[in-house]
Amino acid sequence: MTDPIMSNETIIRRSANYRPPIWDFDFVQSLKSEFVGELNIKRIDKLKEDVKMMLNKTMAPSDQFELIDTLQRLGLAYHFGDEIKRIVKSIYNSHRNDNTWMKEDLHTIALQFRLLRQHGYNISQEIFDIFRDELGNFKECLHEDIEGMLSLYEASYLLEEGENILEVAREFAASCLKKYIQVNKDQLLSMIVSHSLEVPLHWRMPRLETRWFIDIYEKKQGMNPLLLELAKLDFNNVQATYHEDLKYVTSWWRNTGLGEKLSFARDRLMENFLWTVGVNFPPQFGYFRRISTKVNSLITVIDDIYDVYGTLDELQLFTNAVERWDVNAMDQLPEYMKLCFLALHNSINEMAYDALREQGFHIIPYLKKAWADLCKSYLVEAKWYYIGYTPTLQEYMDNAWISISAPVILVHAYFLEGSPITNEALKSLKEYPDIIQWSSMILRFADDLGTSSDELKRGDNPKSIQCYIYETGVSELKAREHIQYLIGETWKKINKEREYIDSPFSKIFIEVATNLARMAQCMYQHGDGHGIEDGETKDHVLSLLVKPIPM
């Protein structure tokens, strides 16, 4: 029997040949964790109190920062935000008043530099001058200090524009670390170094890094069993909250009928939820993850309507309907678009109602504008496709940082992350502040590096790599290197935004925007992790959302 929503006898439609989802409704609804219940919560609370005592104990600043770094990498820092904030502020203020800490070793100074910058303190790159010779080069004797080299390498990724000392530090440390793993004197340390060289800590998706680091920490000499037990219990407890989030969003998705009726589109609910875990993992942000998953799923379907299925006339009608944000605009839409538009309209209006009820702000104008801007950017790319136009890289990026959908994701995230809504932030939000633009750029570049080959094979528009090749005549390898360079340059701008100077946005929102960039590099590191489910993405889903850590 032919589906009336999908049938069309006169129009030839393209197909991306996306595979059906590997995580079905029944599988998600069956997810169950044994790491829930009063006994687990009591044990976690007891261990948390023990850690608070450790944090409040008098110890050297270097030991305090080692503990904070371990807590962050084990995914536990969110429990101790006030204590960590107090310690970091105290150490920063003491550093401003004396230079005794400059007598520390390279590892300690680099670790403190990284953590202070991570927490928004603009500590000078010149603290590394004591490790440089009169010509400005890092001293050759540092080659033997692998732990110091690793810390220096990780610290260098928090650089901002114009910080040449950190550029030189990165090259020096990377060269040393690459030589070390060839010798492989210490298997565990070599594994940690290789992991860092593949993707630096500052660019990694936090929750996936936590899962990896828990296994590493267990093998480390001097490991604290208390911290390890808490990390495992907490990871499994948080995973159990994800199960409840997933059951909610899979029921919502099934009720929309979009996965069933619009078979040309990617049905990727589990992957869309994984994005939200990458962006904001703590358990208390369940509402954030649930609504963000709806947003991500709607974006995925609408993207496929513009990229694959819709005709140019239909796409113009859909764009107009979203701009009007009026259910009466549905009358002119074909049947398959009516279903999508109504799901979009109802889901976003429901979120706006929650914001009006809870905070007294009418946010539909901001949400509507973000969706309209997205659809208009999709329409630009559709027109380019139909006339066979290849833009310059700059012309492409002027549109593509919006069409990658990060502005829509982050505008919604602002209203979901729980901080008070302010008029100053709303004014900035309308024009898409720098933190949104820079996060969007990295998502676009990472997506293009991971997906452009597959998309070109099925006849899609040229992406940033192809635009740069067309414009300059360089090889694909050189073009990819250029896009990687642009990712690095954009990270410098994000790092500047993370100083929170005169920002109308909360630290939570800026962290969410940063994490979106991190999640992009995770999802597209080995290809199209969003469209193709059965590679690295499947492993990520299993390790973060399905399989608990053995105790």
Curated annotation (Swiss-Prot):
Mg(2+) 1 binds at residues 303, 307. Its cofactor is Mg(2+). One of its GO terms (molecular function) is sesquiterpene synthase activity. A motif (DDXXD motif) lies at residues 303-307. GO terms for biological process: diterpenoid biosynthetic process; sesquiterpene biosynthetic process. SUPFAM superfamilies: Terpenoid cyclases/Protein prenyltransferases, Terpenoid synthases. Keywords: Lyase, Magnesium, Metal-binding. Mg(2+) 3 binds at residue 455. Mg(2+) 2 binds at residues 303, 307. It holds the Pfam family Terpene_synth_C. It comes from the Eukaryota. InterPro entries: Isoprenoid_synthase_dom_sf, Terpene_cyclase-like_1_C, Terpene_cyclase_plant_C1, Terpene_synth_N, Terpene_synth_N_sf, Terpene_synthase-like, Terpene_synthase_metal-bd, Terpenoid_cyclase/PrenylTrfase. Binds 3 Mg(2+) ions per subunit. Its EC number is 4.2.3.-. Catalyzes the cyclization of farnesyl diphosphate to sesquiterpene olefins. Belongs to the terpene synthase family. PANTHER family: OS04G0344100 PROTEIN-RELATED, TERPENE SYNTHASE 10. The Asp-Asp-Xaa-Xaa-Asp/Glu (DDXXD/E) motif is important for the catalytic activity, presumably through binding to Mg(2+). This is Terpene synthase 10. It comes from Ricinus communis (Castor bean).
